Amino acid sequence: MKSHQGHQKKRRMREMGFSTLLLGASLLLPVSVSASAPPSIYSRPYDSSPFLSPQIPLEDLSSLSGTHEFTLRHIFHRGTYQHPDLHRRLDIQPHTQLWVLSEDGTDKEAAEFDTPLIASSHPVTIQRLADRRPSVIEEHLLAARMSGSASVLSESDWVMDTLAGPDVTDKNSVLTFAKMTANDYIQEPDTEDWQDIHGRFNYSSSFGWQTDGLRGHIYADKTNSTIVISLKGTSPALFDGAGTTTNDKLNDNLYFSCCCGQGGSYLWRQVCDCQKSAFTANLTCIIEAMNDENRYYRAALDLYSNVTELYPDANVWLTGHSLGGAMTSLLGLTYGLPAVTFEAVPEALPAARLGLPSPPGHDPRLPQSRRYTGAYHFGHTADPVYMGTCNGVSSVCTWGGYAMESACHTGQMCVYDTVDDKGWRVAIGTHRIKAVISDVLEVYDDVPQCAPEEECYDCELWKFFRSNGSEHTTTTTTTTTTTTTPPSTSTSTCKTPGWWGCLDESTTTTATSTSTTSTSTTTCKTPGWFGCKDPTTSTTATPEPSLTTTLPLMTSTTCAHPGWFGCRDPTSPTSTPTQTPPPGDTTSCESPGFFWGCWDPKTTSDHPITTPP
């Protein structure tokens, strides 16, 4: 009975508490509305209600479809290696003169924007974080960097949004995005129109800042409701020194190699020292190198945050080619943005290592298993970079120093089968974006159907381990000391020194050597061209006699007639060495042959056969 009354009391208190809160909220609501507090740039419409979850009105899906005409509005340049503090912006005006460089960096021509860039939008469903403020995203990335794995977020932190995204089923729209990526090689020569977003130095007089860093081109439609960020991809030059090729190679080998260019060809450029043994590496060391502030991914995050400050309410799309396409996809996975890439390097490997947020039910170590990412990767089967096969010993990528070992894409792949359809051979020359536009995108009547990649894994031969990041490399040297003791010698005083030593009398040393040898004594009766043709008749074992050698004993103790090279006094030896030769048969030949052998008539001799003891 008491228990039942207690439950009723608790229920009444909860009901009273909830009613009191609603009454207080209704009383404070007019005051909140009348307040003139400045709105925050990160505020959302549902932030004013602390009790009810945000109710997003369901829009008509037909309103998400439309046509957009884009124009180039800005060029952002984010420094990395040589100028890590550099971040500049060039606003495109009607009088701005731009130049387009060829993909090999040798030719240039004036840029023309007469052809409109038209793309269609289509509803796209993306599973992304509900709170996508840059400060919140940075907290998730920092936690992943400190712990070594992606942050574990609850299911309530994720939303399934349907928004207006690029129509990847429309050929003209796909061509428009490809042309945007081709224009990523635009440079502005000899102008002072660049604005410093932040930076401690004046780079207007520097000639090298444009060759260092990541460049992004910002396209916007007429209403500024949709913008496209296009990131610059890898230049095709194989050797260092052409524009940003050196930095591109460092980032390629850092993000898309199993261990920073280690453990493979000696031609690969190594960008870290994290390998500990054959196919074994320190994953913590690799992740720390990838998160350095002078890397392209960090530059892409900074570039995106500055672009969204200019267009805070715009719908953002991403596009890029090659390395720029991979950075585009990583940026899209981070913020939940639709991305369209062309011939992008497989980027699932760096996505897993960077610790990008992953929704519940998905393994963060396998981002290629995620669905609803909004990423679409266009490419063809003759491109070894896109297919993840540009890593063999004889491949052009290897000879150029690139270690592209990753093979898995996130999102969906839209593949043109140029090998079967056109009989193309796999070659690096088909990777260039202008060749892709003219020979693939414009030639095919329809775009391929996009589908996720199935059963793909990276670096299966490698073993990775984690550490606390405080290890340092030590070298152990083992020194072996060998002490040699010289043999004992007798020391005496030389009474008669000479020019080349002491002339005192020497001592007598007797050396006795005893050995047993087996000899064969025969007489050749039938000599041949290449030796004796007689059969072996007997074998006699004879012990070798002892050999005794006696050194002469000098009788003189003083030198009466010293010379330049010794004493000229006569010496008298006390003994003479004797040597007893071993017994043997002696046969003389009276008629020798012209070349070898003996022509004497055959003689018969008896040889007794003895039995060995």
Swiss-Prot record:
Cytoplasmic topological domain residue ranges: 1-20
UniProt topological domain (Lumenal) ranges: 44-613
Keyword Magnesium: no
Catalytic activity: a triacylglycerol + H2O = a diacylglycerol + a fatty acid + H(+)
Catalytic machinery residues: S322 (charge relay system)
GO CC term, one of those recorded: multivesicular body membrane
Enzyme class: hydrolase
Major subcellular location class: membrane
EC number: 3.1.1.3
Bias type Low complexity, positions: 473-492
Glycosites: N202, N224, N282, N306, N468
Gene3D superfamilies from the UniProt entry: alpha/beta hydrolase
Cell location: Endosome, Multivesicular body membrane; Prevacuolar compartment membrane
Keywords: Autophagy, Endosome, Glycoprotein, Hydrolase, Lipid degradation, Lipid metabolism, Membrane, Signal-anchor, Transmembrane, Transmembrane helix
Example of a GO biological process term: piecemeal microautophagy of the nucleus
A molecular function (GO) term: phospholipase activity
Annotated InterPro entries: AB_hydrolase_fold, ATG15_Lipase, Fungal_lipase-type
Transmembrane portions of the chain: 21-43
UniProt-listed CDD domains: Lipase_3 (cd00519)
Protein's membrane topology: Single-pass type II membrane protein
Oligomer and partners: Binds to both phosphatidylinositol (PI) and phosphatidylinositol 3,5-bisphosphate (PIP2).
Family of this protein: Belongs to the AB hydrolase superfamily. Lipase family.
Function: Lipase which is essential for lysis of subvacuolar cytoplasm to vacuole targeted bodies and intravacuolar autophagic bodies. Involved in the lysis of intravacuolar multivesicular body (MVB) vesicles. The intravacuolar membrane disintegration by atg15 is critical to life span extension.
The protein's name: Putative lipase atg15
Organism expressing this protein natively: Aspergillus terreus (strain NIH 2624 / FGSC A1156)
Organism ancestry: Eukaryota, Fungi, Dikarya, Ascomycota, Pezizomycotina
